Amino acid sequence: MVKNFLKRTLCIVLSFAMMTGTVMVGAKTKTESIHSKLPAITASQRVRAKQAKASAAAVQLNATNVYTLSDFDTLSNKWQANQEMMLYQGYSDANEYVKVGIVRVGIDGTVVIPYATKVAGVDGGRLKLCYNGNPAMTLSQTNNGKMIWAGAVKAGTYALYLETACENANTPVVAAFGAAVISSQNNRTFGGNNVIASASTGAATYQQFKVSKRGVAAIAVYKENAAGNVSSVTYSVQKLSGKTWKTVATGLSGTAKNNYVVTTGLAAGTYRVVANAASGEILYFINVNQKASDSYGTSKKKAKEIKRKKSKKQVFLSNESTSKTHWYKIKVKKTGMTYIDITGLGNKSKISVTVTGAARLKNKTISKGFRIYGKAKKGTYYIKIKKGSKGTSGYQVKYTK
């Protein structure tokens, strides 16, 4: 009896470490950043003629508020078209740190100022962002000669000065600059095409997303520093329960190879990502939900039937036990070749699959998963899928033929 049963049973462990492609949505999960969208600025692009010494008080610019990568993309295109920028043209006094303009910052965040200068006819003079009216009171900032990056800036009025004083009077100075402030506001909602850009203050950053139906949340969280380096972030996911946030997943961290996407099985509800970065760094939050809410059986007796050429998608939640099982069945109406395809809905998924029935089937690797196949006799075949690890996200089981 035992020998006959083993002939009719297939038990395999399927590892879906390669499954990231099933949840990615093209360009919006590509690693984009502020630096990758910056245009080239030149001091001469809008210069028409020499002017008398200008008043920097007349050269004022409101920094554009940036909440998403789309916001910055739009602003960058305007800069490229010489819009949303200011131009200073004038002459220095002797030994003067020339003030070339005023920047008004309306919200707290990281300030990004692309600029270009021409001093005494030579390109490349550096600017610095200071508290208004005092060139000696410089904000903490990174400056590469083309862009100023200042973190944890409070809303207020600031000024741009030449970093080096002009020794001679009547030195011609030209400066072109734009200004953006990436918001440090917490508790915004991200998802779909809404890629949040959030300036870190050094404390924990919280950004929210929603899951409408039980499924797989494909989340990408990464950060960018003042030098333009992009890297991974270790973060946790919390679910709102009543008025309390409860942690449901910790130690999550994506890799550059898969554009920092990590998949997590979650029930319907409101969630937030908790991430940390150094002050001034920009955190990016991307979320793509893949629904996986088809019904499943909780026991062999309650197995849900999958019709021929149909499939079911389901997910093991991140906080479910590794002993959790889902049951399905197919009905083979006549003897012949039968194919059952099982694919993952997330990276690093691991499940075990047991198939029992009138014939023992084989298995082989297919794109993004495994195929269970063979000449099946007429009858009912049961498919038991068991959660294999805490990292399990989701799967699809299809009665292909």
Question: Which stretches of residues belong to each language-model region?
Answer:
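Hydrophobic beta-strand segments within beta-rich accessory/binding domains
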Residues: Q89-G90, V100-G121, Y158-T164, Q208-N229, ...
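Edge beta-strands of jelly-roll/beta-sandwich modules across compartments, strongly enriched
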Residues: D123-G125, L162-V181, S231-V233, N259-V261, ...
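Short, surface-exposed beta-strand/strand-loop-strand elements in extracellular ectodomains
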Residues: D123-P135, V230-G242, K348-A359
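Exposed aromatic-hydrophobic patches
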Residues: K146-A152, N258-T264, G369-K375
